[in-house]
Amino acid sequence: MGKAKRCRKVIHGRNQSAVINPNGQYPIYGSGGIMGYADDYLCPEHCTIVGRKGTINNPILVETKFWNVDTAFGLHPNETIDYLYFHYFCKGFDFTKLDKSTTLPSLTKTSLEQIDIPLPPLNEQKLIVQKIKDIFTQLDKITAEL
């Protein structure tokens, strides 16, 4: 199994004030979730959002096109990595290890690009994702029975 640094694109967010539209087609995301809607998007489908400032350790999976605000990065995996495998990796990664700030937790594009991601073949990634989904299904059943 290899490791990869360049298996995702880091997409800078931008201020949403010029594109915000309550009837817009695309959600506007910050690191805490949906903040509104827009008529334009910055990120394609199947991205994971990671906060740039503030909430940096709560990755959010977005399966539609969206606009990310200037305090959030959109991480888009390339064709060598399954987007759900990538998201589960992000959920388990401690982004606070990359924080170099002294006050407000912060991440940089450079630090995100330097993360080594274990990269098994694509078919194995899909098997890992299915196993994770199966475990979550079992957990949901157990929780419902409590």
Locations of regions flagged by a protein language model:
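A common structural junction motif
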Residues: 94-97, 136-137
